[in-house]
Design a protein with these regions (language model features):
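Small-residue (G/A/S/T)-rich helix-start motifs and N-terminal tracts that mark the onset
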Residues: 1-116
């Protein structure tokens, strides 16, 4: 068994309708690759994980936030990081996430490393 975790999204993603937006992204990505997923059902998890990451990225872009769950741990005896360097952003609603999806997909397409 494998566990996939995405810590990309800002806290502002916890808003009404955001789960519906995620469900739509997952459904759209799965539908686009239907035959491929029928041939290899193990790819469903990767497709869903990609949708979750894209959802979080779009939320971060909409909120103008670089906040995410996976922070470098603070260890005893190490210099403190300047927390003010992290942009908290601003509250968003589900339609803000939808509006940011094209930019999120563009960013992913321009930074992707495709395997042959």
């Amino acid at each position: 068994m494998r566990t996939l975790v995405c810590g990309r999204a800002p806290a502002f993603l916890a808003t009404a309708g955001a789960g519906d937006v995620l469900a739509g992204i997952i459904g759209a990505l799965l539908a686009q690759r239907a035959q491929e997923l029928i041939d290899d059902p193990t790819l469903v998890a990767e497709m869903a994980a990609g949708a979750v990451y894209t959802h979080g990225l779009a939320a971060a872009m909409a909120a103008h936030s670089d906040q995410h769950a996976w922070q470098t741990p603070h260890l005893y005896g190490e210099p403190k990081q300047d927390i003010a360097q992290s942009a908290c952003g601003h509250p968003i609603i589900a339609s803000d996430v939808i509006a940011a999806l094209p930019s999120a997909f563009d960013l992913l397409n321009t930074t992707a490393r495709y395997e042959d």
